[in-house]
């Protein structure tokens, strides 16, 4: 949360707009590093196999591993797009192009970003 406050203060100082995005579907795309099993959800129980459990292939919203899987997927994407990870805060990503700067702050499934030039935000 402190990193977000710093970004807001920096954006105000630099005079650039901030944008916010909520990426709920990102939780459904994160890969899991370990095997995770869940019990049958209410209303979907198999009467013949009441104790059957399911192994998840992807992260599921509400799963304790979901935020980390989400962050790792988003981080890989941003690094492939030439962003640099923040040295002090690894949830901040920077993209410099000549005299322009784009800053992205990732907080669980929320993204706050702003730039010295609006065309970088597009």
Describe each model-derived feature in a short phrase.
Residues 1-122:
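Long, low-complexity, charge-biased intrinsically disordered regions
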């Amino acid at each position: 949360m402190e990193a977000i406050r710093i970004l807001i203060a920096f954006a105000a100082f630099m005079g650039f707009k901030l944008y916010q995005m909520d990426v709920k579907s990102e939780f459904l795309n994160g890969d899991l590093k370990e095997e995770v099993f869940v019990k049958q959800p209410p209303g979907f129980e198999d009467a013949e196999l009441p104790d059957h459990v399911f192994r998840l292939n992807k992260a599921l919203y509400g799963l304790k591993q979901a935020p980390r899987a989400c962050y790792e997927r988003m981080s890989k994407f941003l690094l492939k797009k030439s962003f640099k990870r923040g040295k002090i805060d690894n949830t901040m990503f920077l993209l410099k192009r000549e005299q322009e700067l784009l800053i992205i702050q990732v907080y669980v499934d929320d993204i706050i970003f702003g730039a010295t030039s609006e065309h970088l935000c597009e």
